């Protein structure tokens, strides 16, 4: 590495808000299954506190050694609906509390996996877990929840979609922060290091380390140097920058896995913003020539960014995965917040952008009087985009306040302006239930 690369890396960290967003340890809980829910809870606590005992210390050690901030240390676990199904319990709040207790004991920021996979229907534990979500999130501090309601191979479980509209409303009524820790997915991935949607897939190794990086500020600074040049130059610049960011992510992941004595999983190539000025995906898109995010051309700019991040990242790391793309959470991106406030970015444009970005309608505040069926219909729209386009999409919606209000979450979750929602009813559509079949192009065998 020559001196220029060293100075570039220092500038990325000190001036451009580069950091490792998360080191996430995935832990299988399949060996914690027990017909007695209290024994299962104890086994879960013991396994997490044993396997992840040194996660925070190792993360801090690597951050100090390399001089690179590692913002979050997290844990993801096997979907709890699979663990709870072996018991006769009628709710799984006790398992959520075991996760929360373990997370506090080891000092991690969040623990994900209070989850169910229901893309083709409910098994015994799924419905119980889904109905436990409002209380589980209200009575814990660090637990995150996700439900996968659709996939390209299975179609969309519209009964589950309707249920999740209701659950989001109930969760919002029971706690202020609960809905910020609840994600509804289509095509959820098993190795996601980011919250709130992380869970440890059943096909994964017993314990793994996954890494998520953050570098919108680095990309923006690189694009400032090629202002006015062609898209060919823009694409090459983004690709080279993504390579540098991902290289550091792989180094951190490999160091963590070696020191913790567990397998290295993947680096997630996502560009994850924060509310800090200079750490915004929206500002990257504007640097390409848009007056403001939300205007015509936004979706094309996002497509270029997303694709080149993947191309640069894949060359830098031999194991990539997770969501891998650009995140567009409204409350967590100061440029997105500004675009909503000036009227150029609305829900409909955000939905179009989700056909390309790595997640979906993320951290978006809507009026608290929005009907559950309307929320369910928003989930159905997002799921349809994901299912048809063979990509992950998700909804993390915050029904709080009234249109125009600002909802304050603090920290990385930021501030969300309450956005206008189409007032026409979707009740008859959502009340049908059943399954939207898988698309024809999913039939590959």
Curated annotation (Swiss-Prot):
Gene3D superfamilies per record: 3.20.70.20
InterPro entries assigned to the protein according to its UniProt record, in alphabetical order: UPF0210 (IPR007841)
Domain of life: Bacteria
Subunit and interaction comment: Homodimer.
PANTHER family in UniProt: UPF0210 PROTEIN MJ1665 (PTHR37560:SF1), UPF0210 PROTEIN SPR0218 (PTHR37560)
Family membership noted in the UniProt record: Belongs to the UPF0210 family.
Protein name: UPF0210 protein SPG_0223
Organism in which the protein naturally occurs: Streptococcus pneumoniae serotype 19F (strain G54)
């Amino acid at each position: 590495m020559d001196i220029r690369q060293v100075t570039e890396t220092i500038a990325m960290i000190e001036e451009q808000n580069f950091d490792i967003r998360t080191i996430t340890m995935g832990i299988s809980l399949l060996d914690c299954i027990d017909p007695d829910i209290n024994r299962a809870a104890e086994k879960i606590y013991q396994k997490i506190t044993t396997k992840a005992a040194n996660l925070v210390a190792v993360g801090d050690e690597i951050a100090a050694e390399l001089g690179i901030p590692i913002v979050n240390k997290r844990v993801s676990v096997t979907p709890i609906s699979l663990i709870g199904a072996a018991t006769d319990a009628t709710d799984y709040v006790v398992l959520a509390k075991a996760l929360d207790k373990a997370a506090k004991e080891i000092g991690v920021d969040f623990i994900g996996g209070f989850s169910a996979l229901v893309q083709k229907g409910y098994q015994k534990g799924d419905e119980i877990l889904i109905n436990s979500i409002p209380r589980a999130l209200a009575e814990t501090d660090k637990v995150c929840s996700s439900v996968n309601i659709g996939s390209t191979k299975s179609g969309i479980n519209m009964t589950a979609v309707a249920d999740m509209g209701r659950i989001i409303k109930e969760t919002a009524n029971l706690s202020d922060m609960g809905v910020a820790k609840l994600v509804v997915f289509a095509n959820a991935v098993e190795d996601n290091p980011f919250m709130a949607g992380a869970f440890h897939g059943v096909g994964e190794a017993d314990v793994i380390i996954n890494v998520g990086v953050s570098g919108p500020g680095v990309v923006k600074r690189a694009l400032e140097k090629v202002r006015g040049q062609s898209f060919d130059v823009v694409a090459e610049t983004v690709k080279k920058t993504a390579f540098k960011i991902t290289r550091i992510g792989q180094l951190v992941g490999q160091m963590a896995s070696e020191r913790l004595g567990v397998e290295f999983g993947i680096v997630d190539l996502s560009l994850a913003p924060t509310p800090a000025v200079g750490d915004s995906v929206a500002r990257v898109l504007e640097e390409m020539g848009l007056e403001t995010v939300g205007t015509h051309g936004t979706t094309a700019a996002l497509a270029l960014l997303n694709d080149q991040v993947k191309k640069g990242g894949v060359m830098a790391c031999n194991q990539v995965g997770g969501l891998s793309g650009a995140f567009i959470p409204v409350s967590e991106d100061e440029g997105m917040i500004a675009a909503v406030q000036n009227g150029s970015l609305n829900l409909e444009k955000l939905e179009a952008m989700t056909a390309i970005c790595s997640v979906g309608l993320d951290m978006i505040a809507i009026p608290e009087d929005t009907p559950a069926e309307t929320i369910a219909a928003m989930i159905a729209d997002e799921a349809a985009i994901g299912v048809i386009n063979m990509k992950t999409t998700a909804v993390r919606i915050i029904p709080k306040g009234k249109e125009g209000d600002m909802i304050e979450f603090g920290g990385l979750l930021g501030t969300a302006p309450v956005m206008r929602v189409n007032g026409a009813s979707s009740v008859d559509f959502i009340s049908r239930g059943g399954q939207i079949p898988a698309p024809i192009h999913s039939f590959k065998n």
